[in-house]
Amino acid sequence: ASIDKTQPEIVSYKDYSNQNNVNDFVNLAFSAKITLFVEKKGFTGKLIWNTKNGKSSITILNPFNSVISKVYLDKSNNSLKISNLSKNKKEIEDIIRQIFGNKKNVFILEKLIMTPPTQLTSKKNVSLSYADWKVDYEGVIEKENKIFPKYIELNKNKITLKIYIIKWKSWLNKKDYKQEGYEEFKAPAKINLFLK
């Protein structure tokens, strides 16, 4: 369900890329409820996303709060690692491939999630397109003079990912990070890599 049905402002990816964005988070953590549809197959769960100095740890949980997969992104060496903890390993890998396609898309979609467009306000929703993706941002949660969307929806062909932000936090230094109880970025040594 959407927060507000006013017509969103349409922003091109080129304009978005050229923005000087005060909401460009270097260190950010958020938790969210997610709904994913791939064709007619649906999945609900939770997402816990921690980003610190260009490294992200994304934990995907099922509706019962059991971890099914962890994704690790590192912008410094353009690496993506996936630790699949589910019994349905092959199915989850296929779904992730369908959603993202390649590594470049993963990092661009991460930017689209972590850095909302400057046009997004409490009164103005935004719609942005990148390649085959349409990204809708609705509502904002404001903290420390920064905003983060309440709701993000990504659509591509027969894939829809809805992200309902529960809470988010940004911080400036390691001390603040540790006080908030967020874990350090540590990608496991033995991990499945399958996106090129």
Give the location of each predicted region.
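Non-transmembrane domains of secretory- and envelope-associated proteins
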Residues: 3-8, 81-86, 130-196
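Short small/polar-residue motifs
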Residues: 12-17, 43-46, 66-69, 117-118, ...
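Short glycine/serine/proline-enriched coil/turn segments at secondary-structure junctions
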Residues: 37-41, 65, 144
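Short, ordered beta-strand-loop transition motifs
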Residues: 50-52, 120-123, 141-146
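An acidic-aromatic
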Residues: 53-107
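Extended, positively charged loop/linker patches that create polyanion-binding surfaces
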Residues: 94-137
